[in-house]
């Protein structure tokens, strides 16, 4: 017998006998049948060496080659297995044997197993087994085997032919179980399977049952694999074959081990879509007749009959292959395709586990061969780009054994019929670079269906989803699913996103129905005993009334029994009707809720609270922004249009430009809108345009281009809107930005979308864009003196003059195409002195809130408020000087007093001025403390 190594060695786990080099090499040298790596045992006898002048040299070379090739099967042996083999040689030498027989290998296994239960939990120890073996060895010495010399090592003893067959079967067992190692349990299984007379005699004398020992060994192997979380697929289903004679050779074991024929590549890696369609496991395919006809037309060609479906994810490429399978199952195809089968290839399963060099290519060639031999198979490869360009030998770089190169010849000759499917981007990356591969496929473009076609598709699938979710989808719900998904989920394609919408809506409705039933059952358990007794008495009274009426009005004749029986039958019918659950109805409101959860956009129907909020939105904004009614009305009108659904769906909610003097509330109005309608001020995305003054900073909005630092990272504007599409985007002080930013804004204002540096389209259709600008503030300040702002003109005429001045400045600064895309340009009015008191109340309310967090109250007299307004008013600077006055006259004074310990939690501070006009501060209803009023210029 001879063993050779046909592949490179596998990685050996750390717990194996990594340091058994010398011992393993010596054993291998004496055996002549153990090699390094994955061993394959050859079942032919050694040919006699040729006789001649150079015969000795040939024999020496063969021996050297055999030693080099068979350097150690023991590298696959675990540490325990190598130890058992070495111990078996020691036992053979101790018994005076000239070769290691199977019984000596059994002694080595028994000596290696030092567990408390003995060898394989049988209670057998080495001393007892050695004594029994001595008597057997005296009768069954290996004929012709030389006795070992006294000075030789145990590892110099060779292995008998029977022992080599044990190793051979152990290797087969390991391979069939899917193991990458050989343990003592594998050797024991092989030893018990071989029908060796001396081994059987030894086991009988020890009182052991070989089948029971084999079962224990197999259990230990499975437990060891499960403990390491790496149990291979064949270990759990492995069964020990029946015993065969020791001289039967390798063929007997090959037949017994491979009695169950392995699955072919088609059955292992493919799913028969035609069988699935015949069994009704494929959903009905609605539409796509043109695409399916085009696929059939390509398949019926003589050569290059391989269609490739190209389209975005979710448009229904796989459905076209399933539709063709349905047609074949129904016989609605040309006679050429009646006997064909559509087999869907699982690319992930094909690639998974191909860890050795060339194993993936071997699987692909086997698959191609089986398809060619079958003759009736059309292979469907979904996501074909995962397979093209892969390959362990060529590293996916187009080398000789690249998978694409393996497919080209059979595809060109028509031996392999294939329907491929991939996206347009992946086709450009993998197929267009390889012209030879691309011309073997005929492209079929699969477009996204229209909304009308998507509604038809959902109507065709409605029954399937109603059966699964045990609910009813109304026609309005189907239409809403298509409309809402098309408008508010722009990053996915129809019909996939609409199908997912009704699927999740049905799931949500079913869960809510379950929760309602659970709450009803809980409420029954929470009832008091008195309530139960009241219900019982009411039922008894009703029963008595019904019984008396039956006795009173039922006839006395013989058919009276039938008259009495009729009400009971009616009662049974009523009970059966009550037991039938009412179907769950999924309408537009349920669809809208799910769409809102997906997109973060409130698209459900307006509730009473929503209507109240929208109607009172103007008033809420006026509470925070004083004296800017025009701007408040403009921004509230835009929000109302969007919420009702009357705004243009292809543009942002509104694009507004706020202009005017500084400090009049342009940014504050945007913050107020975010807090009042969008939930909080954090819902606002604020970009300070002073950070984008240089040309190279413009790209930060959409992401850096290739070759620049930051490429691959997300853009500041695009990523924030993509994550949170329903938001307010504030471009603060837009005039400070570089003019190139206006080119980016043109597309957002007009088309409602923008592509980032990664090529992803980001929708701005649900954002409200507000730009603020101080353009014209200098001219306003000058014009107020030169144009008569302080004359006796009315306020309206002054505002009209100021607005005209600002509009001229805007037209001079911005390009006409940008101004023409802005929905509304609002010029804020300058703040009057009479409006400062209302603004002061808002500022003081914020100060009171911060003091309340410290446990201290604050009251400010009217005289003190007048003093603050007097010192904090400047028409050129708006309300910001007023905030500085509050900081100086109130916050600074109170902080000093708190630090000196004059006020503690629970006190209330009263801020006032005395008769001399000086600032004073006191506890409420206590002694007044006068303070000198420090002067400060605002």
UniProtKB/Swiss-Prot annotation:
GO cellular component, one term: chloroplast
Entry's Gene Ontology BP terms: cellular response to heat; positive regulation of response to salt stress; positive regulation of response to water deprivation
Location of the region described as Repeat 1 in the Swiss-Prot/TrEMBL record: 84-145
Binding of ATP, residues: 311-318, 660-667
Region of interest (I), residue spans: 266-519
Entry's localization field: Plastid, Chloroplast
Taxonomic superkingdom: Eukaryota
GO MF term (any one): ATP binding
Keyword Plastid included in the entry's annotation: yes
The name this protein goes by in its record: Chaperone protein ClpD1, chloroplastic
Family: Belongs to the ClpA/ClpB family. ClpD subfamily.
Transit peptide, from-to: 1-83
Miscellaneous field: Plants overexpressing CLPD1 exhibit improved tolerance to drought and salt stresses.
Chief location of this protein within or outside the cell: plastid
Keywords: ATP-binding, Chaperone, Chloroplast, Nucleotide-binding, Plastid, Repeat, Stress response, Transit peptide
Tissue: Expressed in stems, culms and leaves.
Induction: Induced by low temperature. Induced by drought stress, salt stress and abscisic acid.
PROSITE patterns found in the cross-reference section: CLP_R, CLPAB_1, CLPAB_2
Region (Disordered): 234-255
Role description: Molecular chaperone that may function in heat stress response. May interact with a ClpP-like protease involved in degradation of denatured proteins in the chloroplast. Chaperone involved in response to abiotic stresses. Plays a positive role during dehydration and salt stress.
UniProt-annotated stretches for the region II: 586-777
Annotated segments matching region Repeat 2: 159-224
Domain named Clp R: residues: 84-224
């Amino acid at each position: 017998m001879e063993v050779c190594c046909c592949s490179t060695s596998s990685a050996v786990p750390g717990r194996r006998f990594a340091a058994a080099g010398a011992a393993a090499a010596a054993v291998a040298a004496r055996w002549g049948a153990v090699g390094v790596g994955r061993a394959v045992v050859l079942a032919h006898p050694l040919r006699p060496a040729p006789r001649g002048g150079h015969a000795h040299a040939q024999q020496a070379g063969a021996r050297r080659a055999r030693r080099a090739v068979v350097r150690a099967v023991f590298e696959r042996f675990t540490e325990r297995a190598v130890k058992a083999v070495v111990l078996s040689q020691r036992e053979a030498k101790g018994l005076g044997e000239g070769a290691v027989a199977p019984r000596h290998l059994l002694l080595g296994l028994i000596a290696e197993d030092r567990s408390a239960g003995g060898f394989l939990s049988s209670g057998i120890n080495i001393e007892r087994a050695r004594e029994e073996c001595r008597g057997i060895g005296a009768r069954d010495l290996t004929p012709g085997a030389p006795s070992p010399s006294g000075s030789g090592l145990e590892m110099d003893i060779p292995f008998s032919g029977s022992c080599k067959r044990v190793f051979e079967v152990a290797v087969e067992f390991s391979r069939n179980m899917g193991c990458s190692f050989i343990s003592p349990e594998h050797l024991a299984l092989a030893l018990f399977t071989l029908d060796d007379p001396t081994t059987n005699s030894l086991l009988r004398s020890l009182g052991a049952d070989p089948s029971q020992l084999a079962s224990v060994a197999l259990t230990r192997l499975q437990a060891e694999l499960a403990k390491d979380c790496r149990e291979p697929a064949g270990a759990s289903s492995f069964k020990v074959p029946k015993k065969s004679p020791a001289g039967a050779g390798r063929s007997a074991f090959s037949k017994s081990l491979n009695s169950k024929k392995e699955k072919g590549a088609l059955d292992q890696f493919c799913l028969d879509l035609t069988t699935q369609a015949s069994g009704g496991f494929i959903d009905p395919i609605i539409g796509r007749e043109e695409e399916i006809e085009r696929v059939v037309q390509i398949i019926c060609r003589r050569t290059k009959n391989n269609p490739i479906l190209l389209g975005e994810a979710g448009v229904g490429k796989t459905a076209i292959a399933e539709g063709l399978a349905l047609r074949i199952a129904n016989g609605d195809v040309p006679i050429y395709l009646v006997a064909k089968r559509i087999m869907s290839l699982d690319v992930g399963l094909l690639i998974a586990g191909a860890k050795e060099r060339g194993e993936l290519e071997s699987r692909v060639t086997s698959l191609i061969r089986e398809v060619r031999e079958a003759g009736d198979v059309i292979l469907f490869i979904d996501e074909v780009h995962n397979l093209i360009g892969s390959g362990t030998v060529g590293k996916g770089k187009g080398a000789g054994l690249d998978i694409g190169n393996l497919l080209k010849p059979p595809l060109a000759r028509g031996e392999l019929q294939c329907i491929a499917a991939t996206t347009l981007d992946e086709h450009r990356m993998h197929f267009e670079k390889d012209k030879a591969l691309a011309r073997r496929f005929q492209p079929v473009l699969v477009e996204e269906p229209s909304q009308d076609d998507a509604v038809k598709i959902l109507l065709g699938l409605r029954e399937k989803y109603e059966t699964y979710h045990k609910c009813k989808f109304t026609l309005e719900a189907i239409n809403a699913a298509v409309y809402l998904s098309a408008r508010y989920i722009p990053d996915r394609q129809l019909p996939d996103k609409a199908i997912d919408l009704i699927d999740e809506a049905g799931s949500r409705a079913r869960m809510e129905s379950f929760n309602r039933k659970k709450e009803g059952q809980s409420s029954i358990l929470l009832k008091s005993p008195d309530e139960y007794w009241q219900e019982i008495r009411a039922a008894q009274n009703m029963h008595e009334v019904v019984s008396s009426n039956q006795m009173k009005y039922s006839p006395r004749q013989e058919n009276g029994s039938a008259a009495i029986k009729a009400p009971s039958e009616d009662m049974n019918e009523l009970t059966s009707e009550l037991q039938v659950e009412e179907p769950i109805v999924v309408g537009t409101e349920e669809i809208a809720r799910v769409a809102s959860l997906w997109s973060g956009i409130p698209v459900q129907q307006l509730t009473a609270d929503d209507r109240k909020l929208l109607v009172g939105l103007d008033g809420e904004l006026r509470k925070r922004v004083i004296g800017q009614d025009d701007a408040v009305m403009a921004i509230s009108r835009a929000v109302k249009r969007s919420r009702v659904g009357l705004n243009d769906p292809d543009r942002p909610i509104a694009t507004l430009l706020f202009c005017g003097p500084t400090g009049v509330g342009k940014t504050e109005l945007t913050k107020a809108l975010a807090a009042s309608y969008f939930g909080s001020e954090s819902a606002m995305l604020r970009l300070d345009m002073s950070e984008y003054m240089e040309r190279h900073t413009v790209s930060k909005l959409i992401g850096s281009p290739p070759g620049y630092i930051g490429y691959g990272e997300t853009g500041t504007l695009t990523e924030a809107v993509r994550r949170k599409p329903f938001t307010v985007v504030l471009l603060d002080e837009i005039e400070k930005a570089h003019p190139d930013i206006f080119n980016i804004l043109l597309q957002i204002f007009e088309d409602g979308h923008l592509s980032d540096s990664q090529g992803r389209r980001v929708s701005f259709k649900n954002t409200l864009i507000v730009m603020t600008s101080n353009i014209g503030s200098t001219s306003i300040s000058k014009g107020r003196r030169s144009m008569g702002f302080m004359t006796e003109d009315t306020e309206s005429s002054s505002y009209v003059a100021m607005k005209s001045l600002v509009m001229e400045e805007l037209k001079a600064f911005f390009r006409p195409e940008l101004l023409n895309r802005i929905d509304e340009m609002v010029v804020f009015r300058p703040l009057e002195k009479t409006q400062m008191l209302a603004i002061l109340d808002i500022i003081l309310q914020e100060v009171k809130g911060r003091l309340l967090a410290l446990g201290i109250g604050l009251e400010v007299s009217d005289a003190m408020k007048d003093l603050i307004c007097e010192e904090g008013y400047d028409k050129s600077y708006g309300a910001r000087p007023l905030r500085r006055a509050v900081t100086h006259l109130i916050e600074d004074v109170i902080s000093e007093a708190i630090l000196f310990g004059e006020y503690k939690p629970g006190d209330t501070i009263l801020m006032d001025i005395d008769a001399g006009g000086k600032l004073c501060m006191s506890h409420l209803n206590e002694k007044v403390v006068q303070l000198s009023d420090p002067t400060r210029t605002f």
